[in-house]
Amino acid sequence: MKFGGTSVGTPQRMKDVVKLITDGEQNLVVLSAMSGTTNSLIEISDYLYKQNLEGALTCINKLQDKYLGHIAELYSTDEYKALTTKVVGEIFDRIRSCAKTDFTSREERIIVAQGEMLSTNMVTNYLLEQGHNVQLLPALEFMRTNADKEPDLKYIKEHAELVLAQYPNKDIYITQGFICLNVDGEVDNLQRGGSDYTASLLGAAIGASEIQIWTDIDGMHNNDPRFVENTTPVSHLHFVEAAELAYFGAKILHPTCIQPAQYANIPVRLLNTMDPIAPGTTISNITEHRKIKAVAAKDNIIAINITSTRMLLAYGFLRRVFEVFEKYKTSIDMICTSEVGVSMSIDDRTNLIPILNELKKFGVVEVDDNMCIICVVGDLDWRNVGFESIAAQALKDIPVRMISYGGSNHNISFLISASDKQRALRSLSDYLFK
């Protein structure tokens, strides 16, 4: 079970979370930092990078006072108020110990990690005060990344099992999301996917019956509710469908979180702490055949077109183009080819200028900025006649720069101008879901 920053954002919401995790099952619970805390810790780090010690200490004291207020509200006994005040004080002393003139990214990572330390200690102590059989598990004892900054799956599995074996008879285990050790043994974080990724990795490592991701939204919706009215939650998604939606813009879940659960074949449920009886969305390896599930949009896309007569009947041309993107570690979202041209889209403009300069060796390069990918997701196997034509018909009045279909049985994507995004989402909703 994973609960995000909003779900543990106030003492009352922490109490609500406790009601959900004390359900009679043996639960491993992953918690994010309280909402707003990570931003405050980053602000403290910014002051220290600028060598503004006074500004950093002012922010530290202000944040600690805020937590002292949370403690007074959360606990009912003097014993646990005093115990948690002591623990929280030690965490803030750790933050202050990083406040020095030779401040580096190492100290920043230590500071940012304290948000999860605060939330997990507070919830664990509240559970103890309420008489529950609970154990706090330090994530730094089993979460680690390798030399490529990817999760070390073998290490995580082995060490999570070792730590859990030390406390075999507990009903609830609490641990931190997001944070880990890197290959050098330094405090670090998972970077992509955050606490959701931690929950998925741990669920796969221990063979959980299911992985629950609790947020303030009742599952994945069939369209973006910020732009389309009357969207509805999708009751079930295949792992690939969920990954496609997450990659192409569904903010409720990061695409990296799907992979560990999919490999271990463990269902993922997206649930709402504000409405815990809502069914949410279940993600599994089951496909609902011949059904379109949802639409998502990915913003800030750049389209690149290369036209070259040298490409005609030439082998190795695409390989050389791809090598440019590999060199600059830039992923391609969509690609279409013809006899004399290739078009592709990217969303990372970090190395756009050097990429374009190198691509000009191959032909005439044209760039369209401010584009958007609209992704339609479902069981879109090519043998299922008609679905692609329905999606295309919905966009008949909108200029389409590129279409990608066939790379996946679960996705058809349209590249359009960002200015047409809302109109496209609404039209697709009208055609597909009404």
Q: Language model features by range: what are they?
A:
Residues 25, 132, 266, 330, ...:
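Short phosphate-binding/catalytic loops that engage adenosine nucleotides
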Residues 238-310:
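A conserved active-site cap/scaffold subdomain adjacent to cofactor or substrate pockets
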Residues 279-434:
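A conserved regulatory-domain signal marking ACT and ACT-like small-molecule sensing domains
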Residues 8, 37-38, 144, 181-183, ...:
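Flexible loop/turn segments at secondary-structure boundaries
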Residues 7, 28-29, 173-175, 186-191, ...:
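Structured core elements
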Residues 1-253, 258, 417:
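Nucleotide/pyrophosphate-binding catalytic subdomain
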